[in-house]
């Protein structure tokens, strides 16, 4: 079947893009230091700016690329993202000052959007009854890349130097573009200008707002813990190999994602995406309790695993709900807004977590994030018509 073939092709491309994006993350502060920033406070400031820059421009540009994709096709937007990031990332290997790196990270965010376009393309060709498992499996490509990318990035940096890693990453993005160009086939459809779906435009996007809010809160919850999790690990673990244990605490959620995404994706196909989303969101919230109560490393690891398991199930459900509720002529636009919501969570989550930890203590972050997720679960609960046949389709 065409949708299954495309799924595996996009899985490989997603893996390449996400692995490449994460290859440079472990040594970004060291690279900035290599560019001449040596004072600790300045290094921390520049590292924060350079790391966050890509999320800012990605957040701003995703809906625009989605709108263009709805008019001109998703494949060309996949190529735009892969080739754009290929050129920009390669240029990062030649910078001589931190402001140049910052500018290129901002530009890289402008060109990003490969993952959301891949999801949009896959959603558009997959039968609705298989959407959960297909989008859940597609998500695992990105998860695998985000897990392996930092590991190989650190190894490569030691072996060939910082600058060559950027060149290698540009090569990965170029390979992804070749995969898309030669192996992904998108049918060109004649634009429907007579249906209510084609005319309503933005009015048909408004009912999907609860999904966008849930996407934002999903990443807000995950990212709020990231700035403090290694510090928190040190407060409850006093044995040897602290760095290894802290790395395991961070990575275990990703491994759980690999299990949760396809498993709960299939569950959503059986019992409905709204029910699955409610289960996953409620259980994700409760998974913060063992983390907050942990006095030993085993309980913390268990809580982190449960969190990754159920958060992994939230994203496929959210993606399927977007597919069901968005009119076909605005599907990529809707996924663009959904991706912007995820990036906004990436931006605000770490800021919220670090400020709450500084003001009220490390454990408070877990309780605050749990409360936010539970409130969002209530929000989804009261939106009882979420995922039902939309007005544009009924007409």
Language model feature labels by segment:
Residues 180-193, 381-393:
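Helix-loop junctions on the cytosolic side of multi-pass membrane transporters
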Residues 76-91, 170, 275-290, 370:
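Structural signature of the two symmetry-related core transmembrane helices
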Residues 59-96, 268-274:
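Conserved MFS/SLC helix-loop-helix module at the cytosolic interface between two early adjacent transmembrane helices
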Residues 49-65, 251-263:
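Central cavity-lining transmembrane alpha-helices of secondary-active solute carriers
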Residues 1-3, 185-213, 395:
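Juxtamembrane intracellular "pre-TM" segments in multi-pass secondary transporters
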Residues 27-44, 228-244:
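Short amphipathic helix-loop junctions that connect adjacent transmembrane helices
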């Amino acid at each position: 079947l065409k949708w299954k073939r495309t799924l595996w092709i996009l899985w490989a491309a997603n893996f390449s893009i996400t692995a490449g994006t994460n290859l440079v993350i472990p040594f970004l502060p060291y690279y900035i230091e290599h560019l001449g920033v040596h004072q600790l406070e300045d290094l921390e400031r520049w590292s924060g700016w350079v790391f966050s820059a890509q999320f800012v421009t990605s957040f701003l540009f995703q809906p625009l690329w989605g709108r263009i994709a709805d008019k001109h096709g998703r494949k060309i937007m996949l190529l735009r993202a892969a080739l754009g990031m290929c050129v920009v990332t390669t240029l990062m290997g030649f910078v001589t000052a931190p402001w140049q790196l910052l500018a290129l990270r901002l530009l890289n965010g402008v060109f990003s959007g490969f993952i959301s376009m891949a999801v949009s393309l896959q959603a558009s060709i997959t039968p609705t009854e298989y959407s959960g498992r297909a989008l859940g499996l597609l998500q695992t490509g990105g998860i695998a890349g985000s897990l392996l990318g930092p590991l190989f990035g650190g190894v490569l940096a030691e072996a060939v130097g910082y600058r060559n890693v950027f060149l290698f990453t540009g090569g990965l993005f170029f390979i992804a573009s070749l995969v898309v160009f030669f192996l992904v086939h998108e049918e060109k459809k004649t634009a429907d200008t007579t249906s209510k779906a084609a005319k309503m435009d933005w009015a048909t996007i408004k009912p999907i707002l609860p999904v966008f809010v849930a996407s934002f809160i999903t990443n807000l919850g995950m990212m709020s813990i990231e700035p403090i999790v290694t510090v928190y690990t040190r407060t409850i673990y006093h044995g040897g190999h602290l760095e290894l244990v802290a790395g395991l605490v961070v990575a275990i959620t990703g491994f759980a994602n690999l299990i949760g995404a396809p498993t709960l994706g299939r569950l959503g196909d059986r019992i409905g995406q709204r029910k699955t989303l409610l289960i996953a969101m409620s259980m994700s919230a409760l998974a913060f309790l063992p983390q907050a109560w942990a006095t030993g490393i085993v309980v913390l690891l268990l809580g982190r695993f449960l969190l990754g398991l159920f958060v992994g199930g939230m994203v496929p459900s959210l993606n399927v709900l977007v597919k069901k509720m968005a009119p076909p002529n605005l599907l990529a636009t809707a996924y663009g807004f959904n991706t912007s919501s995820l990036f906004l969570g990436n931006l605000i989550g770490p800021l919220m977590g670090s400020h709450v930890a500084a003001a009220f203590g490390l454990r408070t972050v877990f309780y605050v994030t749990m409360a936010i997720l539970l409130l969002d679960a209530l929000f989804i609960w009261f939106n009882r018509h979420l995922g039902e046949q939309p007005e544009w389709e009924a007409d």
